[in-house]
UniProtKB/Swiss-Prot annotation:
It comes from Homo sapiens. This is Cilia- and flagella-associated protein 300. The lineage of its organism: Eukaryota, Metazoa, Chordata, Craniata, Vertebrata. One of its GO terms (cellular component) is cytoplasm. Coiled coil: none annotated. InterPro entries: CFAP300.
Amino acid sequence: MATGELGDLGGYYFRFLPQKTFQSLSSKEITSRLRQWSMLGRIKAQAFGFDQTFQSYRKDDFVMAFFKDPNVIPNLKLLSDSSGQWIILGTEVKKIEAINVPCTQLSMSFFHRLYDEDIVRDSGHIVKCLDSFCDPFLISDELRRVLLVEDSEKYEIFSQPDREEFLFCLFKHLCLGGALCQYEDVISPYLETTKLIYKDLVSVRKNPQTKKIQITSSVFKVSAYDSAGMCYPSAKNHEQTFSYFIVDPIRRHLHVLYHCYGVGDMS
């Protein structure tokens, strides 16, 4: 049987946790930023609990069981491609894909190289460049150039493993935004928002032996397919349409971070 197809799902059961709030997406300041970036009303975090020990090598069984669970089906939200309204999936998932996303970064010093390489000035202002397109994104500054243009001079300041890190993915998604994104002139709103969302989603603990802080969460980028093709996070594939599953194996919590590319709420 192909990876991620329905088989022995190992007895995972889930429960929706509507009482869990994500301040990083709902505070007044962040809401204002998401509106400017054309992501407001199109990004959502939800929390679920589960009842079995999570084992990362069984991630496909875990994710498939999630989509089949009667407590998930009426509660997992996604945006309708046709109406733009929040809906539930409403179709039977036949196959899933869960890609491991490394999550090891404990500090925003990861982004100091943006200053070191003159992509951001000491003042925090992002260095401008001549306009170009990397479809569908307008590139008008050095930040978007280093994020998107593989043959650009400074692309390699972030290695491929760096770019796969959840912290980098989150930062890049916020920088690129939605369909009518108004870009920031300074770097701080992107860094601050990335940090707040990351801290809200990712779990850490102090190692009892070494006394060092370590990340306990596992992160996966998830897609689901019905008999017609991809149905989640959307039937339409886009770099800015995503769903990340952040699994805390100790608390047995699953955080789902979802965004669907489009025109965000203006009001």
